[in-house]
Swiss-Prot record:
FAD-binding monooxygenase; part of the gene cluster that mediates the biosynthesis of calidodehydroaustin, a fungal meroterpenoid. The first step of the pathway is the synthesis of 3,5-dimethylorsellinic acid by the polyketide synthase ausA. 3,5-dimethylorsellinic acid is then prenylated by the polyprenyl transferase ausN. Further epoxidation by the FAD-dependent monooxygenase ausM and cyclization by the probable terpene cyclase ausL lead to the formation of protoaustinoid A. The lineage of its organism: Eukaryota, Fungi, Dikarya, Ascomycota, Pezizomycotina. This is FAD-binding monooxygenase ausC. Keywords: FAD, Flavoprotein, Monooxygenase, NADP, Oxidoreductase. It holds the Pfam family Pyr_redox_2. The keyword Flavoprotein applies. Its EC number is 1.14.13.-. It comes from the Eukaryota. One of its GO terms (biological process) is terpenoid biosynthetic process. PANTHER family: FAD-BINDING MONOOXYGENASE AUSB-RELATED, L-ORNITHINE N(5)-MONOOXYGENASE-RELATED. NADP(+) binds at residues 154-156, 299-305, 322-323. It comes from Aspergillus calidoustus. Belongs to the FAD-binding monooxygenase family. One of its GO terms (molecular function) is monooxygenase activity.
Length: 670
């Protein structure tokens, strides 16, 4: 492996930073390793300062087909027939659903969030599949798993708890950690099982939602998409709208200087082009890269899975890294059918939710912990991640110090692993993470670090000089030009920290009663009821983390939102008087302010994020110091439920057990 981009050895703050105990943890009398805490903390801060200086301040490109961004914006899978070869039928189905104009329920998003909303509504008995229409810009079900089909794609959360509705569908995942194609196929399975496959309007972009106070409906406007570009506008109406755009709906593309001048192949990881690289998700032999000079920008969770394949097949690979990933072992293995039958299916009804709750207990560091760690993976051995997602101990005065001590040992082990697997010691230094483990989503992979030993791979450190601009033939980083035939943008997504509201995450303009917009509600002191509905946006429900529960297993938290929304709607329709066909729901002012106050009182649970290196979890290093006290309070109102997902779910269940719909304002109309 040839190392490049580390010429700036004069920057002794990091390149030559050596303190006792930080590169090889000492051992105590019992043989356990422990690092020199003060030395490590000093290096963490030195690295953070370098990262803050190195972080790009360029804006993000909104990838549309306008201005020549066709390759970045288009759906590469839209022209591919589904397993039944029915892609043309999908457009006919869309036309049929649009011809009905008005629908009882519109769900925006056809990923697991949208599907769970639909399934939980159906289970109330108050809704039929024919009442529901699902809109998505994709040409199929799956959400982020529809778009992401890059080589090596897998889920980092155990499939037995991540893939929803396994118990209901009777499906056994093939492996402990499922591939992207298996997960996408499971989304299609759910749609078929509940009769939702004919209720989807694919290649449909909802752009505008406006509440009609006279008719008590949502007017919906947007565009119908073809294989490549926008084709025509549409309008429809819905009594109820559920937003399920997800946290990773919009690829993030930094607007690097002169990026439009690049003449080679350029695509984002969420828009992988197998026609150029060769291979497929199911058979990722990238034979088209045998004579290609490839560069990949970014070394986050997607890149960690992609880089081993690029290293194996490309003529040369340049890995542009600013912040190294913290990579632990994955240890994937096939599902043993005998074990599955004995340990899972034989446990009776509710086995999946019990396993999910067990996983949550360990990742949120509940006390006391369950006696049995069912999942038993890297996530459940990382209690410090509770500082990011919340937990029952987070508000204790000394909790951060406790978690820092635990995390120092874990991160030291992660760094030891990098040095053990990467042959070049200079490369190993660059690939070791010097930040608290909860500051960035940890990665789990068995081939990533060893792939960087390949002779055709170069690692370019962007912390000092950075990636300054594109050229027609490549990029310039640290003052050196790298000529590349293909550049892969592994630059992530716009996420809730930078696009806080559910509407903004889906690029939807939402206007409710009295001109109230969703963006204004989120910017000026958010108040919701349980994180799923807000006043002046009636009959609008959403999933997310603001004022709701957060956890590592995203499908579990979304399912809790969906279950709660379905309960509210189901009970409201049960209570409607005879001959009333419409119900209008919104929180009372007192109800949502009380809930917001409880969220605010727990917001300090996330104080451990302060001081993290820049990344999507903290708005790419955006400081709160420049905000006024009022603005800081408004930001705190956007927090998740600080006591952890179990506490949040318990509060919702207690509320539902009362059966009073407390805090919900209901209007019944003929």
């Amino acid at each position: 492996m040839e190392m490049r981009g580390i010429e700036n050895k004069s920057d002794i703050a990091l390149a030559e930073f050596r303190l006792t105990g930080i590169n090889g943890p000492d051992k105590d009398s019992s043989g356990s390793t422990y690092p020199d805490a003060a030395a490590v903390e000093a290096k963490y801060e030195a690295e953070r300062q370098i990262q803050l200086r190195a972080h790009e301040t360029v804006s993000d490109i909104e990838i549309t087909v306008d201005d020549g961004w066709t390759d970045l914006a288009q759906d590469p899978w839209a022209g591919c027939p589904d397993p039944a070869g029915e892609t043309p039928h999908l457009l006919t189905q869309r036309s049929h659903l649009l011809s009905q104009h008005r629908h009882r329920v519109l769900i925006v998003g056809a990923g697991f969030g949208g599907l769970l909303f639909a399934v939980r509504l159906l289970q109330t008995g108050q809704f039929k599949a024919s009442d529901i229409v699902i809109a998505d810009t994709a040409a199929g079900f799956g959400g982020t798993w529809y778009w992401n089909r890059y080589p090596g794609l897998m889920c980092d959360t155990e499939s037995y708890i991540y893939m929803p509705l396994l118990e209901e569908t009777g499906y056994m995942p093939r492996d402990k950690y499922a591939s992207g194609s298996e997960i996408r196929q499971h989304a299609e399975r759910i749609a078929r099982y509940w009769g939702l496959e004919t209720r989807a309007m694919f290649r449909t972009s909802v752009r505008d939602l406006a509440w009609d106070e006279d008719k008590k409906i949502w007017n919906v406007a947007g565009r119908l998409l073809g294989d490549v570009m926008d084709t025509e506008q549409f309008r429809m109406a819905a009594d109820i709208v559920l937003l399920a755009s997800g946290s990773f709906a919009s690829p993030r593309v930094p607007n690097y200087p002169d990026i439009a001048k690049y003449k080679g192949k350029l695509f984002h990881t969420a828009r992988w082009d197998y026609q150029f690289t060769g291979g497929s998700l199911e058979n990722p032999k990238l034979t088209g890269l045998a004579d290609k000079r490839v560069g990949i920008i970014g070394t986050g969770a997607s890149a960690v899975q992609i880089i081993p394949h690029l290293a194996r097949y490309s003529r040369s690979l340049i890995v542009f890294q600013r912040t190294p990933a913290a990579v632990d072992a994955r240890d994937n293995r096939p599902t043993d059918p005998v074990w599955w039958k004995e340990e899972m299916a034989s446990q009776g009804a509710g086995w999946q939710q019990r396993r999910q709750k067990n996983f949550n207990a360990f990742t949120c560091n509940e006390t006391p912990l369950p006696g049995n760690n069912c999942v038993g993976d890297g996530w459940t051995r990382m209690p410090s991640f509770s500082l990011l997602i919340g937990g029952p101990q987070n508000l204790a005065p000394d909790y951060i110090d406790q978690m820092r001590a635990v995390d120092l040992v874990r991160q030291a082990q992660i760094r030891e692993r990098a040095h053990a697997l990467v042959q070049d010691p200079v490369a190993a230094d660059l690939l070791t993470p010097w930040y608290p483990g909860w500051c960035k989503r940890p990665c789990f992979h068995d081939d990533y670090l060893s792939a960087l030993n390949e002779e055709n791979v170069r690692l370019v450190d962007l912390r000092h000089g950075g990636l300054s601009h594109f050229t027609p033939s490549g990029v310039v980083a640290n003052g050196e030009e790298y000529e590349l035939d293909l550049i892969v943008l592994s630059t992530g997504y716009t996420v809730p920290v930078t696009r806080a509201s559910p509407g903004s995450r889906g690029n939807i303009s939402i206007t409710g009663r009295n001109g109230m917009t969703m963006e204004a509600k989120w910017a000026n002191g958010l108040a919701t009821l349980h994180g799923v509905m807000t006043r002046d946006l009636p009959n609008l429900f959403f999933a997310g983390t603001s004022q709701a529960g957060a956890c590592v297993n995203l499908t579990y938290s979304v399912d809790q939102n969906a279950t709660h929304v379905a309960y509210i709607l189901g009970k409201a329709f049960e209570r409607r008087p005879p001959n009333c066909d419409k119900v209008v729901l919104q929180p009372t002012h007192e109800g949502e302010e009380q809930w917001a106050g409880e969220v605010l009182a727990r917001a300090a649970a996330f104080r451990g994020i302060a001081g993290c290196t820049p990344g999507y979890l903290n708005g790419y290093g955006k400081s709160l110091d420049s905000l006024s006290p009022e603005q800081q309070v408004n930001m705190a109102r956007l927090a998740a439920w600080g006591e952890g997902i179990a506490s949040y779910v318990n509060r919702l269940e207690e509320w539902r057990e009362k059966g009073e719909l407390e805090g919900v304002e209901m209007t019944f109309l003929n």
